[in-house]
Amino acid sequence: MSTLKIDDQNEIYYEYVEPKGDGHTFVFVNALTGSTAAWNGVIGNRITEDGNGFLAYNFRGQDNSKFNEELNLDTDLIVSDLCLLIEKLKFKNIILVGLSIGGLYASLALEKGVKSNGLVLINTLRKNNSRLKWINETMVNVARYGGTSLLMDMNMPVIASPSFLDKMKPNALNTVSYTHIRAHETVMNRGWRLLR
């Protein structure tokens, strides 16, 4: 567990397992609601059993990755961070693996010059349409208002099994973790006091 420091307000959290010999490094690119936890366990263990390694990392704004709140966490920034991470850690013999929109980010990293021996797309949509644009814009708005915790809580019933939801419930649906809402309430409360 490490971080790549970009500056005093920005850093990228990552977990790296080195491959053996000529093994590949699988670079896992999260979904918007993802985290390194999605890749550890079954997936990570299976890859390392074959002598390969992996890099799992969190985008700025996801768990343990700090970011300047004035930054626009958009596609260009996320793809640039992926390229920077691969360059700084000097990975060779990589295979990019993108989950959901992470597949788009991995594809765009290839367009920016990242050298990869393969590209694996998991649940990545091929065509943008009105429905997908609506969902993506809503997800961004939810993240802006309540942070990634609220975004995760909104999406879990759609992407997880009922038994998994039951296991997650004690650590989910906790409004204390909706950071942006608290900041908004603080500003609103201060504003109302000024009007009294």
Report each predicted region and the residues it spans.
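Conserved small/polar residues in nucleotide/adenosyl-binding loops
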Residues: 179-186
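Hydrophobic alpha-helical segments, chiefly the membrane-spanning helices
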Residues: 191-196
